[in-house]
Amino acid sequence: MPGDDKGMAGARRAFLAQDYYAPLRRALCELSVSLTGDHPRVLDSGCGEGYYTAGIYHALVNAGKAPQMAGIDISKSILRLAAKRPEPIEYAVASSYHLPVADGSIDLLINCFSPLAREEFQRVLVPGGHFLYVVPSARHLWEMKEVLYDHPYPNEVKETPYEGFRYVTIRHVEAVIHLQTQQDIHALFQMTPYYWKTPKDGAARLSALDTLDTTISFDIHAYERI
C-alpha cells in the first residue's frame, strides 16, 4: 500500500494531536488567511491525516470567510483518519501528479512535505491563485540527527523559481520542542525519511532515549500562479 500503513498513520495522528508542530500550522493559517478572498477554494495536496487542513479551515472560518476545502493523499489508511474529522472537508485518495479537480478551480493549494507537481499545480490554480510549499529548513530536527548520525549535515535551503509562478515570499518557522516519551520520539522518527535510511546503531541510540529536545525548523515558500 502506498503512503503510511495503518500503524504509522495512527502514530502520526497521535503525534500531531499533541501540537508539537503547532508553530507550523499557525504560520500556515496566517498565510492562508492573508492570501485568500471571501470564498476561497482550497486544496491540500498530500494532506495526511488532516492536521494542517483542519487548522486552515478553522482559521479561514474564524476570519469570516466561507472556504470550500479538499485534501488528497496516496495513503488510504491515513485518509480514513482524516475523514473522521468533523470539519466539512472532502478527502480523496489521489496523487499530487493527478489531482482530481478541474482546471483553474483552486484559489490556494497547500503542499507540506509532499512532491511538488509544478505542471499539475499550475493547471488547477486560477491565475492569481497561490500555493504554499513547506520544506524542512537547515536545522530541522538537528538534535535528533546528532543522535542518529556521527556526522549530521544541515538540509539544503534554497529559493527555487518555477515556470508559470511568481515567487512571493518565504516564511521561516523555528522552535524547540520537548518530546516527553519514547513513543513520541519514535512517532516523529517514523515521520521522517531518516526512518528508512538510518544505520541500526543510530536507531538504537534514539530508541534508548526517554525524552528529547529538538529543533523544528521549516520554510514556507509562497508562489503566485501567473
State the predicted function of each range.
Residues 3-27, 31:
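Class I SAM-dependent methyltransferase Rossmann-like catalytic core
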Residues 49-64:
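Conserved SAM-binding loop of SAM-dependent methyltransferases across substrates and taxa
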Residues 97-108:
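A short acidic, Gly/Pro-enriched loop at the edge of an enzyme's catalytic core
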Residues 173-226:
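Conserved Class I S-adenosyl-L-methionine
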Residues 39-48:
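Conserved class I S-adenosyl-L-methionine
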Residues 75-77:
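Conserved SAM/SAH-binding beta-strand->alpha-helix loop
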Residues 128-138:
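Conserved beta-strand signature within the Rossmann-like core of class I S-adenosyl-L-methionine
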Residues 87-99:
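Conserved SAM-binding strand-loop segment of SAM-dependent methyltransferases
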